Amino acid sequence: MLTERQLLILQVIIDDFIRSGQPVGSRTLSKKHEIALSSATIRNEMADLEELGYIEKTHVSSGRVPSEKGYRYYVDHLLSPQRLTKDDIQKIKSIFAERIYELEKVVQKSAQILSDLTNYTSIALGPAVKENKLKRIQIIPLNQQTAVAIIVTDTGHVENHVITVPASVNPSDLEKMVNIFNERLIGVPLVDLKDKIYKKVADVLRKHIRNYDSMLQTIVETLDIPQEEKMFFAGKTNMLNQPEFNDIQKIRPLMKMIEQEKDFYRLLRKHNRKGIQVTIGRENQLSEMENCSLITATYSIGDEQLGTIAILGPTRMEYSRVITILNRVASDLSIALTKWYQNG
């Protein structure tokens, strides 16, 4: 159990190191107005904090820096929310300034604003398309042989495919087919569409449309939509601006991981609990991220959780500011999506 004095010194060390990036010594601490202690007393307390594993010595300075254990204690027990500036709030509101027709676009815009506000790398995981439900199908003829099939989901996800129209299918049959699809398939999850088409719609088409089968096969093929969530990055190279990553050899494995994306996809899939989650350094269980922290939050429509947004930065991250911003964006995103997609 840390004493009040040790808690104060630990907090000031971490706050100072986050601001400056420089190891903190007893002389620096003795000049802080909030610490009315002698250098000798501070040195003794710092020695105890080091022995307990909350701070550690660097090879290049007599000062101390926070350890992972120190950051974890700081995040869990010493952090206080930071007030957002008017400019911060205005930028967050700009995400929702326009009516949202495609959920993916607003998620992508959220990632960009998060990166702009924090100067770190932001990642957003969109909703899994397989969770989407069909809102409508349109087929727009381009000429006698080709048309564009448009599939729109309840979350605004849009898929466009150019298809070949069989010579045996005339425009009125095509229109009739689309009407039957929209009458019988609206609200069906995309993952179930093919099954429903063959079990419930094919018989109806057979009764009303001659030579329906070749066109049906063409439309069914357009429903092969990727099932995984889409992932959006913003500020991919922002980590290069952090002093701890001046050594390109140190940052190269992380940058490679960011470019390949699949490890981040798996990582974000794990972070699906409600509320803010902070994983620090080796807690991420990836060697490329042992000098990084990941802060995540989920967003939803009503009670239905849709995806995850995250900030990736150095362990020397501005936790208070980032958590406040991320919490606000996740909350505002959920409120806006619920209003637009659930309540119309």
UniProtKB/Swiss-Prot annotation:
GO terms for molecular function: DNA binding. GO terms for biological process: negative regulation of DNA-templated transcription. Keywords: Repressor, Stress response, Transcription, Transcription regulation. It holds the Pfam family HrcA. Gene3D superfamilies: 3.30.450.40, Heat-inducible transcription repressor hrca homolog, domain 3, Winged helix-like DNA-binding domain superfamily/Winged helix DNA-binding domain. The keyword Transcription regulation applies. Signal peptide: none annotated. Coiled coil: none annotated. The keyword Transcription regulation applies. Negative regulator of class I heat shock genes (grpE-dnaK-dnaJ and groELS operons). Prevents heat-shock induction of these operons. Belongs to the HrcA family. This is Heat-inducible transcription repressor HrcA. It comes from Geobacillus stearothermophilus (Bacillus stearothermophilus). The gene is hrcA.
